[in-house]
């Protein structure tokens, strides 16, 4: 039966480039968001940058080193944090795992204690150090994971979904920690996350890739300006009013209406609203659409272009 099935079916192999023609530089002390849908090539890129994967073409340089050579000078200066992976020993206290890392990175007792004290203060994790890792909650474990990843005070951080699965409060704490660590040490950080709150809070610059290709590299604020053809006008009046003549009504709640207008017409429509509704207007804001909406539009347009062979 097995032989019969083998005669009916044959393996076919297809090469799918995970990353192609992606080129960027990151300055010292910069925090850059690295965005893309699942399967875009983000984790593959981080693995090449950290030396876990060998690039089949092109060149990768981090701090002057070629990552796949795994030289000690590079390994002692970088770290990779993956939200769904652990580098802690499951059955022993977190403090013992950190001691193991002290030996791996050959840290002096003075250097180790200074780094541990700083991380313990930043992460508020003193009560967690003497608990077996298996007894920690996900949020508690991520605190210790960060301590383990940063105990050697790396100059470059690759953060792959560091807040995945965490509650809103813990996400905010991790963001504050990353920001504080960057400010204190001047470390360069490349961050992937599907939580746009992470990106907005930490990154002034974003890189967007899709199907392994670079779509955008620039200021986060410029992403909406370049990719979103409309803006939102939110108007609050002293009484109910129909504002459909000024733009597309996106939402209406009590006396507050949100209008969608083309980017080119936004200034004129805003001025027109102020002129026509003076004496009735309590508040008016002009803003870009949410970053999630902009990113979704970028991916959708890229998918259409890919299907069309553009």
Feature annotation, model-predicted:
Residues 91, 132-136:
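Conserved ABC ATPase signature
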Residues 153:
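Conserved catalytic motifs of ABC-family nucleotide-binding domains
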Residues 157-161:
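Catalytic Walker B motif of ABC-type/P-loop ATPase nucleotide-binding domains
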Residues 175-262:
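ABC transporter nucleotide-binding domain
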Residues 2-8, 99, 103, 111-128:
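Conserved ABC ATPase "signature" region
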Residues 231-302:
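Short, charged/small-residue-rich alpha-helical element at the C-terminal edge
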